[in-house]
Each structure stands twice: as structure tokens, then as C-alpha cells.
């Protein structure tokens, strides 16, 4: 996908789960490599779905080394000069309240914006953390429309 996009002067963003850093593969030469490391080498942008409902929990998923991983997502992105976009969940979900900002946003309109500002401040040492993706933002929009 990346080669095709490059040939057409298009950009590609790889949207991946936060636990991708835990996985390795063996290449044709028999060398074991990290999947996320490879993706950040060939891509200009990755979106890491860091679905948690607090700044500290999101920060742990992207800036700390996960169990079973050798490096953090930020370590790979920084080493390979790849932008790391942090994906935040905004929809009501059956996966549990801890994976989405839906409930917090209903209780305190604008909460997700304050969390983004907190993450930006806390992780300011990383040059490639400046972008965020709010997944299922339409849920928040519909909620705001109904309360007006």
C-alpha cells in the first residue's frame, strides 16, 4: 500500500491497536523483527488506537514499554521518524467504560479536549506526538446536538 501511495503522491496512515508493539515476525532471512518497527520504517504516519479514558492511561499505552514488547510505540516512531497519531475513542461501547471518553464527555462537555491538552503537555519530549484522532466523533456530535 505504501509503495502505491508513494507512486501516486498520496499519504497512508496505518491504524493499529496499541498492543502491536508486542508482536514480532520472522523475515525471509530468518531474522526476527518487530511488526510496529517495520510499519514505522515504511510509513510516514501511524494511528495508535490508545483506547482508554484518562490521560495517564493513554500515555502508558503509547509512551511505556508494553508487556512482551522491547520498546514503546514512541520509541519506534521516533527512531524511524514516523508521526504517531494517538487515537482516542469517543463512542459509547460495550467493551467497557474504561476504553472510551463517552461517559466523561457527557458529564463534562469538553473533557476530551482537556485530556488531549494534558497528554500534549505530559509527552512534550516526543517530537512525533502532536496529532490526535478522535474515533467515532459523530457520537459526541449527536450527543451535543441533542442537548442544545
Located regions from the model:
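Alpha-helical scaffolding within the catalytic cores
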Residues: 22-39, 58-76, 117
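Aromatic-lined carbohydrate-recognition surfaces of secreted/lumenal glycan-active proteins
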Residues: 1-32, 79-93, 133-137
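Substrate-binding cleft of secreted/luminal carbohydrate-active enzymes
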Residues: 47-57, 71-148
Amino acid at each position: 500500500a505504501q509503495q502505491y501511495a508513494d507512486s501516486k503522491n498520496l499519504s497512508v496512515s496505518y491504524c493499529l491497536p496499541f498492543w502491536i508493539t508486542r508482536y514480532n515476525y520472522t523475515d525471509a532471512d530468518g531474522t526476527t523483527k518487530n511488526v510496529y518497527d517495520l510499519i514505522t520504517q515504511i510509513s510516514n504516519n501511524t494511528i495508535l488506537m490508545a483506547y482508554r479514558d484518562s490521560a495517564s492511561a493513554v500515555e502508558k499505552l503509547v509512551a511505556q514499554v508494553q508487556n512482551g514488547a522491547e520498546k514503546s510505540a514512541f520509541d519506534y516512531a521516533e527512531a524511524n521518524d514516523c508521526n504517531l497519531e494517538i487515537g482516542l475513542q469517543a463512542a459509547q461501547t460495550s467493551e467497557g467504560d474504561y476504553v472510551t471518553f463517552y461517559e466523561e464527555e457527557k458529564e463534562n462537555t469538553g473533557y476530551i479536549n482537556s485530556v488531549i491538552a494534558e497528554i500534549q503537555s505530559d509527552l512534550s519530549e516526543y517530537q512525533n506526538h502532536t496529532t490526535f484522532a478522535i474515533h467515532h466523533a459523530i457520537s459526541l456530535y449527536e450527543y451535543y446536538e441533542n442537548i442544545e
